[in-house]
Amino acid sequence: MGRTRLRLDYSFFWILTFAAWAQNELLWQVLLFSVLHECGHLTALCALGLQPRQLRLSFYGMALRYDRVPDRRRETAVLFGGPAVNLILWVLLRDPANGALFLLNMLPIFPLDGGRLAALWLPHRLTVVLSALVLAVLTGLGGYVLYRGGGVSLLGISLYLMLSNLRSV
């Protein structure tokens, strides 16, 4: 991929070690489908004749950094490339992990694809309000799931997204 820099974050090795130790099939699926998600972005980017600046592997999976695409329609194609992969795999495999990744990534919360799409097409103030509302609902739902004994994952994701948004303000 030419001049694309590959960055391996130490946390990527931590999550691989944890996944191997935990022997959790769902965790491996999510890691694999997250990589395929990013490959969807990469495919869309390359199809438009653009090149990523950086490919980063970290605790959160794989992330692409690229220069801003010159027009909103092509940027939309790049942003939707990842969720489209999860949607296709969800439909074809009837796999709940892909369904969850698709739905999560389409939420209008920055830095998720849905949040970036909202920022691209909606007025800034509306994007901020929409993101805050969805994040509040997601956090409340995560707290409820934890209270009912369903696990900490949703609450953890929503708190991470909340911190990401606070950092960007």
Feature-to-residue mapping (PLM):
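Hydrophobic transmembrane alpha-helices and their immediate loop junctions
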Residues: 1-169
